């Protein structure tokens, strides 16, 4: 936890510039696939595991669903490098870091969906992701009109999607 706090409070780290980024903690223990010893473990940053959660949630629910909560289980791991307590969770939330937690009698899950933006409009990941999805969908949907005359009939066609 101390390393996370140091990183977030480091003056070189400026989260207000990015509503596209997110931080997750802690690192995750898993099997070392490259080791000769099949029982060898390795500690990895959560990024690959988080990408898997994003992909699974997107496929099952859509980009509007936060990749967090009880559906956002971390798969293929052996444990976390640190057990995040409720108190730790509160501190991480204040710092804009999404916790990965193991709850008693349950599995390990992502328990936060914040971006590192200080802009309240972009604080939550699903908002940014939905905006990106809409922007991309609209852009793709009107490509047919790029070289059409910019006039009232074109605007009417775009509005009715003809």
What is the predicted function of each stretch?
Residues 1-161:
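Structured, hydrophobic secondary-structure cores that serve as assembly/anchoring elements
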């Amino acid at each position: 936890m101390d390393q996370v706090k140091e990183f977030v409070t480091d003056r070189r780290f400026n989260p207000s510039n990015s509503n596209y980024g997110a931080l997750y903690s802690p690192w995750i223990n898993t099997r070392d696939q490259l080791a000769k010893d099949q029982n060898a473990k390795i500690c990895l940053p959560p990024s690959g595991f988080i990408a898997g959660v994003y992909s699974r949630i997107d496929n099952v629910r859509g980009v509007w669903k936060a990749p967090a909560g009880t559906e956002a289980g971390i798969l293929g791991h052996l444990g976390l490098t640190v057990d995040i307590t409720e108190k730790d969770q509160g501190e991480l939330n204040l710092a804009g870091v999404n916790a990965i937690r193991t709850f008693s009698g349950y599995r390990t899950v992502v328990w936060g969906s914040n971006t590192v933006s200080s802009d309240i409009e972009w604080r939550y990941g699903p908002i940014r992701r939905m905006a990106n999805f809409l922007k991309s969908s609209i852009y793709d949907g009107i490509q047919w009109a790029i070289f059409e005359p910019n006039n009232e009939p074109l605007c009417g066609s775009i509005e009715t999607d003809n």
